[in-house]
Each structure stands twice: as structure tokens, then as C-alpha cells.
């Protein structure tokens, strides 16, 4: 289908010349059956050009030990109910550790209006297509910033997202993606708001539009007992998407715990998605073998 086969130890504040960036840095140990390594965690605020003024985007960088350059994985967060600014900074550690073990730098931006990022994020029934596309500028700013870092490989990026972040990931693929982006990974991508009816039909239709506008390899993960999106809708979304972009793969992983929407964040979910994701990375020609040993 594709083209080829915890505990923080320290914290500090730094400033770069030019635009100031706030860093909160911590050092962690991880391990798996392959060995042991360390990785750092830093919180920075990067600039995104807005309509009237620049916005600061709260962003977390997880960096493996060493000088690099390392391939890049960007992970896009979902949306909690309530005020988006009250949402906590996203730390999807099962996925972070998966990529760290393979010597990726992992960057997790909080989109504008979420957590401590500036700006406002509202849906209020507007187009789900516009909702996804509205976040593309945040991702472009994230990649642009990442490519200023000496330890980032500017030729390899994997874009990952869960829930609304999965939908944003699909939207990004339609918007002249950076040449470094080699693939899109969608975990339970959906837009759902209590205020709005008929979103499922729109998601199905817009999925077709998204598929028509990209040829990037994609992989989709959806379960049978997801509280936010039923499998029938997910199936139809994928059918419409893959009609335009046959370079796509659907993983129906069945039931997971009491809510399949939690697969991405639950450490127990890793044993389900890991073999499929590893095969996908191999197929799209990016690093896929673990090189680290983690705890």
C-alpha cells in the first residue's frame, strides 16, 4: 500500500538572543528491553504569525540524549470540555517514549487558545474543515522553529495526532505540508461538540476533501467502543478519504478498556498500536527500530 517496504532532576530559564523563549527543562530516564538512556523535557514559547499580531504557542520538546541530528515527531493534542485555556499541557508519554527509543525528537505544541498558548480557540458550530485548517499555522510555526535547532534532522518529520489532534493532522496534510513530513498518523480523529448536530456527516464529507488533497501515507486507528465516534462513522470517513488518497491504512483495533478513545493515552494501549505503527514507519522509509533501552 505504501511506497516501500519520572522524575524531573532540574529546571531552569534560558533566553535566546532575538525573541525570548522560556524554557522549563527536566531530565528523565527511560528504558525498554533494549537498554537505558536519558531524555530532556523543555517547555518553550514559539512565535506564530497571527492575523493582527504574533501569538506565543506553548510547546514541549522531548529530546533524546546525544547531539543528533534526530528525526522529528510532532504530536497534536485533543480537546477537553470547558475552557481550552484551562487544559493542561499535553504529555502523551507512551507515544513520547516510543519515539525517544527510536532516537526521535518529539515536539508537542499546544495550539493557539489552549493551555498557556495565546489566542482563542472556539468551534461553536463552524465548519469542521475550517476547524482543522485553522490549526495549520501552528504546525507550520512548530516545524519552522524545529528546523532552527541543530539537533533536528530537517529531512524527516512524522505528524501524529489524537482526537481533534488527529483531525488537525489530516487537515495539515492538505495544506502544502513541509517537504520533511513523510507521514500522517491519526488516532481516533474527530471533532465533536455538545452544541452542534450533524457533525458526523460533515466529517465524512470533509474526509473525502482531505483525501483528494494529499498523497502522504496515512495510518488511522479507531476502536469499537469509542465514546466520541462510532466505528461506522470512522469507516465511512476512511472510505471517503482513501478514495482520494489510496496511500492510507485503517487499523480497526476493536474494543479497548471502557473507552477506545483512551487507547492513545493509556500505557496499556501501546501493545496494541506499537506493531502497526512500527510497520508503518518501516513502510514509509523512516527510522523504526528502537535503539534505546528504557525504564
Predicted feature locations:
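N-terminal cap/lid segment of alpha/beta-hydrolase-fold proteins
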Residues: 36-67
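Alpha/beta-hydrolase active-site loop
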Residues: 127-149
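C-terminal catalytic histidine-bearing segment of alpha/beta-hydrolase fold enzymes
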Residues: 244-295
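Short beta-strand element of the alpha/beta-hydrolase
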Residues: 69-78
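Primarily recognizes the serine-hydrolase "nucleophile elbow" in alpha/beta-hydrolase
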Residues: 141-204
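Alpha/beta-hydrolase
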Residues: 76, 109-111, 187, 253
Amino acid at each position: 500500500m505504501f511506497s516501500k517496504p519520572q522524575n524531573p532532576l532540574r529546571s531552569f530559564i534560558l533566553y535566546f538572543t532575538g525573541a525570548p523563549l522560556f524554557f522549563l527543562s527536566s531530565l528523565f530516564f527511560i528504558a525498554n528491553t533494549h537498554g537505558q538512556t536519558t531524555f530532556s523535557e523543555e517547555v518553550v514559547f514559539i512565535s506564530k504569525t497571527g492575523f493582527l499580531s504574533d501569538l506565543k504557542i506553548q510547546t514541549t520538546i522531548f529530546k533524546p540524549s546525544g547531539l543528533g541530528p534526530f528525526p522529528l515527531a510532532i504530536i497534536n493534542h485533543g480537546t477537553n470540555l470547558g475552557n481550552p485555556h484551562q487544559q493542561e499541557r499535553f504529555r502523551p508519554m507512551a507515544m513520547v517514549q516510543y519515539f525517544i527509543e527510536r532516537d526521535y525528537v518529539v515536539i508537542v505544541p499546544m495550539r493557539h487558545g489552549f493551555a498557556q498558548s495565546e489566542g482563542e480557540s472556539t468551534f461553536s458550530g463552524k465548519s469542521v474543515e475550517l476547524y482543522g485548517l485553522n490549526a495549520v499555522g501552528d504546525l507550520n510555526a512548530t516545524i519552522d522553529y524545529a528546523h532552527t535547532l541543530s539537533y533536528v534532522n530537517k529531512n524527516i518529520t512524522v505528524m501524529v495526532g489524537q482526537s481533534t489532534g488527529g483531525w488537525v493532522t489530516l487537515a495539515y496534510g492538505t495544506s502544502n505540508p513541509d517537504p520533511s513530513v513523510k507521514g500522517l498518523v491519526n488516532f481516533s480523529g474527530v471533532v465533536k461538540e455538545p452544541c452542534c448536530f450533524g457533525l458526523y456527516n460533515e466529517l465524512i464529507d470533509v474526509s473525502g476533501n482531505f483525501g483528494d488533497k494529499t498523497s502522504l501515507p496515512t495510518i488511522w486507528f479507531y476502536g469499537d467502543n469509542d465514546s466520541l465516534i462510532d466505528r461506522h462513522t470512522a469507516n465511512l470517513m476512511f472510505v471517503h478519504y482513501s478514495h482520494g488518497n489510496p496511500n492510507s491504512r485503517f487499523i480497526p483495533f476493536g474494543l479497548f478498556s471502557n473507552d477506545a478513545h483512551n487507547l492513545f493515552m493509556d500505557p496499556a494501549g501501546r501493545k496494541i498500536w506499537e506493531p502497526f505503527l512500527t510497520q508503518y514507519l518501516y513502510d514509509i522509509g523512516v527510522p523504526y527500530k528502537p535503539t534505546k533501552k528504557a525504564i
